[in-house]
C-alpha cells in the first residue's frame, strides 16, 4: 500500500556553510579551524566546495523547480564575527540578507543553523567549547543574529553537538584531532548544551518571532546479541555517549541517574571528571520546555558487543568497504558483520533505526513538541552519465523511500513529524571524505560548478507534489 505524508509536510534539502559556500577567505570572512586542519592533514580543502556563496540563486531556482520547499542553511559565524566576537563584518551580514531574500522569493523556507562544525579559529585555538568563554561569545553571536535577521522564522542553535565532541576528542577526525579523551567529549557536549539552553532562553525572553530548536544526530544503538548482558550494556553505554546525554540535557534539564551512572563508569575506566555547576543545571532546566522542535539527523544504526580491551578506532575515509574498526575501552565494540546492508563507508543502512529513534523521543521526552528529520541521505560514488547529463541514483531513491516509509509509520503511531530534509540539496564537500562522497539531488561538476538534476531529483519532485511515497 502506498503511504502518504501530510499536506503541510516540508520536503527540504540540507546544506551547511562550510560544506557548500566556498569563499573561505572572501569579503572579510575569518578563518575557522578546518582551514588549517585540512591544509595540514588532507588532500582537499573546502575551496570552492559548491560555490554556494555565488551560486545560491541557481540552487534556489532548482529548489523551487523541483518542489523543495525548505532549505537548511547555516550561517558561518566567522563571516559575521571574523574572530568570533567584537567587530562585525558588514559584507557577511549583507550576504545572508541577500540569501534569505532569495529563499523567500523562491518560496523555499530557510531553516537556519547558527553553528555547523565551524567555530572561528581564534576561539577554537583557545579551547573551543571546552572554554566557557566560548559559551558567552556564542550567545552574543546568537543574539546578534536574532536581532539582525527577523526574516528568519526557524532557528537552530547547533548542528550535531554529539558528533562535534566525538569527532574532535574521540575519533580524532575533526580538529584538533584528539583521540579517546572521554572527559573532553562529555565536557564539550555539556558546555554546548548550556550554550544552546542560554540561546533558547534569550530567544524566548526577547520575544523574537519564529521558532527555535536544536539538531541532534541520533544513531540508534542495538545489542548484537540481545540475550547477552554484556552486549546490552555496551549498547546502553554507546547510546549515552551519542544520544541520551544530550537528549537528557535538552528535554529533562538535567542528566538522569542512569545517564550519569554510565558517564561515571566510562570516566572511571578511562580517567577524567566532569565540571558541571548548579548554575549549569539551572540554565538547562530553564530551557527544557522552550524548544519548539527537535531536528533529528539519522543515517545509520550500530550493533554493539561487550569489549574489555583498549580503545581503537579506524575511520573509513576512502569508501573502501570493510575498512572500519570501532572499539572503546569501558564501553564496547561495534560489530560490522551483521545481516544489514551498508554503504561503501561502512554506514549501516537500517530504516527501522529511524523509526525506533523517533518513537524513543516521543516516549522518553514527551515535551519534544515536534520533530523535523533534518538530515538523511545516501553517500555514494555517483557515476555521471555524460550523454544524459544525469546520474541514475536508484540506490539513493530506494534509501530515501525506505526512510520516508518509516517516518509515515511513526506519524501514524503518534509522532509529530513535520518535515524531511534530504542531505544534501546539491553535492557538497564532505568533512572527512572530500569530494568523492556525494549526497545531492543535484550533481555538481566541481570543475565548472554546473548543476545537473539526478534521477532522485525528479523522484523527489513527484513526491513533494503528490505526498505519496512511491
Swiss-Prot record:
It comes from Staphylococcus aureus (strain NCTC 8325 / PS 47). Pfam families: Glyco_hydro_1. D-galactose 6-phosphate binds at residues 19, 116, 159-160, 297, 430-431, 437, 439. InterPro entries: 6P-beta-galactosidase, Glyco_hydro_1, Glyco_hydro_1_AS, Glyco_hydro_1_N_CS, Glycoside_hydrolase_SF. One of its GO terms (molecular function) is beta-glucosidase activity. One of its GO terms (biological process) is lactose catabolic process via tagatose-6-phosphate. HAMAP family: LacG (MF_01574). The lineage of its organism: Bacteria, Bacillati, Bacillota, Bacilli, Bacillales. This is 6-phospho-beta-galactosidase. PROSITE patterns: GLYCOSYL_HYDROL_F1_1, GLYCOSYL_HYDROL_F1_2. The active site is at 160 (proton donor), 375 (nucleophile). It catalyses: a 6-phospho-beta-D-galactoside + H2O = D-galactose 6-phosphate + an alcohol. The keyword Secreted does not apply. Belongs to the glycosyl hydrolase 1 family. NCBIfam families: lacG, PRK13511.1. The gene is lacG. It comes from the Bacteria.
